[in-house]
């Protein structure tokens, strides 16, 4: 690939830790047309879609990379099924309401995964001395200044392999394992976009931006699952009530909303989009063929984050007005369909559960 147009110390480069959103909007308004004009000069024979198809044919994964991801995806699916069987039995033994019996394994699995991968991502971004892309986002392009393809960090290779496998598993899980929700179709699309983003950024060696995307997302997912698990576990069919789960759930929900705004909306815009939609144009390779597609995917993910924040804001508003527990308002409203309140539904589900013969 052709080296960057500027180096990071050039006086015309706007370099900061966290970009001002208004300033960033003006920079992006200039950087995107600049990239297309420059690319037209570099590849005057480019025509859409034939040239893009030709570019896609030039990239591929090695057999070892592909098999590693597929094996990991299979392992994730096996572990998810195993955990589901074990925890559904556990929910019966611990008097969890039947309507939560399938939700507990799903949330516990996601909490385990997202918590683990985010801790590893935190280690990479905050504890590895070779770079500091979180506090200096434009520095993710420094290694391109030599003119060659930068060497990929082993931590990033681990992140990409594990996350790619998880999204392949998640496509299957959304269709066949997870509770279907109002936004499941959007989640399904999200998984494909995430896979496409991982693949294209990997073959273009834009892996540091990709690692930052994942770092800014997984902590809110983990906090959401803590919130959901707390409310699933606080009240039991034997009329026991665990107040500490209630308190933990409320605290986790508040933390979840704060993390979403800071990480997925503010820092995603002012660090990640600043470093990619603006920084990559001037500091990354000039002839990266998939830059427009990668940029579009990043913007789509941001739009999804804004859309999902709609659910969070509605939940906060409902809790503030009614004092009810923050429940997942993406789920299909069983109460409205049946005409029964949740307490009556729980009583009927519990009665039905008690009529079932117990396994010896």
Swiss-Prot record:
An example of a GO molecular function for this protein is: sphingosine N-acyltransferase activity
What is this protein's function? Catalyzes the acylation of sphingoid bases to form ceramides, which are key players in cell signaling events such as extending lifespan and enhancing stress resistance. C.elegans contains specific sphingoid bases, which are unique or different in structure compared to the sphingoid bases found in other animals. Two examples of these distinctive compounds are: 15-methylhexadecasphinganine and 15-methylhexadecasphing-4-enine.
Q: Does the keyword Lipoprotein apply?
A: no
- Topology versus the membrane, per the UniProt entry? Multi-pass membrane protein
Q: Which organism is it from?
A: Caenorhabditis elegans
Domain TLC positions: 117-321
Which taxonomic lineage does the organism of this UniProt entry have? Eukaryota, Metazoa, Ecdysozoa, Nematoda, Chromadorea
For this protein, the Enzyme Commission number is 2.3.1.-
Keywords assigned by UniProt? Lipid biosynthesis, Lipid metabolism, Membrane, Sphingolipid metabolism, Transferase, Transmembrane, Transmembrane helix
Q: Which reaction does it catalyse?
A: a sphingoid base + a fatty acyl-CoA = an N-acyl-sphingoid base + CoA + H(+); 15-methylhexadecasphinganine + a fatty acyl-CoA = an N-acyl-15-methylhexadecasphinganine + CoA + H(+); a fatty acyl-CoA + sphinganine = an N-acylsphinganine + CoA + H(+)
Query: Where in the cell?
Result: Membrane
**Name of the protein described by the UniProt record:** Probable ceramide synthase lagr-1
Domain of life, per UniProt, equals Eukaryota
Q: In which pathway does it act?
A: Lipid metabolism; sphingolipid metabolism
Asked whether the keyword Transmembrane helix is assigned, the reply is: yes
Originating gene: lagr-1
State the family it belongs to.
Belongs to the sphingosine N-acyltransferase family.
Q: What class of enzyme is it?
A: transferase
Where primarily located?
membrane
Which PROSITE patterns does UniProt cross-reference here? TLC
Q: Name one Pfam family in it.
A: TRAM_LAG1_CLN8
Query: What are its GO biological-process terms?
Result: ceramide biosynthetic process
Q: Which GO terms describe its cellular component?
A: membrane
TM ranges are: 59-79, 156-176, 195-215, 243-263, 289-309
